Amino acid sequence: MDNVPLVIASGNKGKIGEFKKLLDDFPIDLLTQPVGFEIEETGSTFMENARIKAIAVSQATGNLSLADDSGLSVEALGGAPGIYSSRYASSDKQRIEKLLAELKPFSNRKAKFECALCIASGEKVLIEVSGFCEGLITFFPKGQNGFGYDPIFEVSGLGETYAEMDHEKKKHIGHRGNAFKLLIPKLKQLLGSMKK
């Protein structure tokens, strides 16, 4: 059987790169969403936004679509930036600076990353999973790897930020890796059923 086309519902190069590494062993052809394709994220949770994106891209392309909505929730900030993580400011650097400034008056630096994944075919949702990683917000950026808030998110018990980890380590303990651990058996089952 030929590889199954699967469109990644994202224009984020960092996410696309991680998806490609995480799904490297699957009989799928990973495609990116059409250039300039914009989806309004109107959900109130990460999963609702992942669902909206997966359905929209699947309907637009006629292929299976995999969407991720993920972000950072900081306890002292009432869960902010949450679903607005990527829209918190206009660049990664500005987002980090804003978050560190808002967190300055607080001693509680607990945070968690969440990743919601959804695979859709047309308007039908086929798979939904979520993964998490608990940690703390550092006082200043540390590390050169990763993207987004990675330089200020220190994983609980490890003493390293995501940006200080190599891809393999982040894949095994990070929120996206944890979500993919749940997705992979379901994706294998889905692909197996498509062969019949």
From Swiss-Prot:
Residues bound to substrate: S10, G11, N12, K13, G14, K15, S70, F147, G148, Y149, D150, K170, H175, R176
Gene Ontology BP, a term: nucleotide metabolic process
Top enzyme class: hydrolase
Disulphide bond pairs: none
Co-factor requirement: Mg(2+)
Binding site for Mg(2+): E40, D69
EC numbers for this chain: 3.6.1.66
Catalytic residues (positions): D69 (proton acceptor)
SUPFAM superfamilies associated with the record: ITPase-like (SSF52972)
Entry keyword Coiled coil: no
Molecular function terms, GO-annotated: dITP diphosphatase activity; ITP diphosphatase activity; metal ion binding; nucleotide binding; ribonucleoside triphosphate phosphatase activity; XTP diphosphatase activity
Subunit structure: Homodimer.
Function field: Pyrophosphatase that catalyzes the hydrolysis of nucleoside triphosphates to their monophosphate derivatives, with a high preference for the non-canonical purine nucleotides XTP (xanthosine triphosphate), dITP (deoxyinosine triphosphate) and ITP. Seems to function as a house-cleaning enzyme that removes non-canonical purine nucleotides from the nucleotide pool, thus preventing their incorporation into DNA/RNA and avoiding chromosomal lesions.
Family in the record: Belongs to the HAM1 NTPase family.
Name this polypeptide is given: dITP/XTP pyrophosphatase
Lineage per the UniProt record: Bacteria, Bacillati, Cyanobacteriota, Cyanophyceae, Synechococcales
